């Protein structure tokens, strides 16, 4: 049984010039995840459920657990003295860590994706993305360090809190998964070099918004629902409402996750920096694809911290089909 710490150190030996800082950074995220896991498991017993009464910069109601998870991860990252600053879905602006001006890395995160599911005991997750800063070490980080295309990510991953808690991450050399053993307090290697199955037969989308979808997405959904034995259609519809949980299932079983633009959200709803980029990095490393309907997600150059994007991610042939339908049936 190999632990996450042992696995990271083992991989570090493959790179003679590695300093161990990235290893320590991922260890900090691991610690934050263990704390969040502990408190999610007793969420119904303590007062951390429901809305906080505070709105974020996008005007969305923040849940108590969103803020709690944000503070725990922020504290874990700051304590290591490696991260120069963070950007979070729950923070209006970047957070600069004083006294860590020499830190090489910045972290972007969605501390608790799908937190509205907590009240009904459905899987939620943490998403993280790591970049090397581009401003000179020894100075405070700026927004420039965070507004990098996803192709510049050093590492990315997620933690899914479900029937078991699992940490899945990549540093650009495959996707690896570790399952948390609460009796030992360690994450143990459960899957190495994960890939999407060759073919996917599941689509994940909130079809309640169907009337607001672009014409190309509507046509693709009808394609998914048509009967065709040669392509094993109709496909199965599975939607949890937590990006991490939906992505994780499709990674294991094969499928596509779709969150298109709508009339009410013409730029899409998911955040490019905190959700789309890290999941796109993982998808490509697992042999899949991620797109905004026209462009590769990892090629997009962000302009603002909380920029949104349409998002299509999963098996490459399914994402390719979605792009084709969007090209063939453009909205007027």
Curated annotation (Swiss-Prot):
Gene Ontology CC terms: cytosol
May I ask which residue range the UniProt record assigns to the signal sequence?
none
Q: What is its EC number?
A: 3.1.3.11
Q: Which PROSITE patterns match?
A: FBPASE
Organism the protein comes from: Erwinia tasmaniensis (strain DSM 17950 / CFBP 7177 / CIP 109463 / NCPPB 4357 / Et1/99)
Broad EC category: hydrolase
What protein does this entry describe?
Fructose-1,6-bisphosphatase class 1
Work out whether the entry's keyword set contains Cytoplasm: yes
Subunit architecture: Homotetramer.
Is Hydrolase set as a keyword in this record? yes
Gene it is expressed from: fbp
Question: Biological process GO annotation list?
Answer: fructose 1,6-bisphosphate metabolic process; fructose 6-phosphate metabolic process; fructose metabolic process; gluconeogenesis; sucrose biosynthetic process
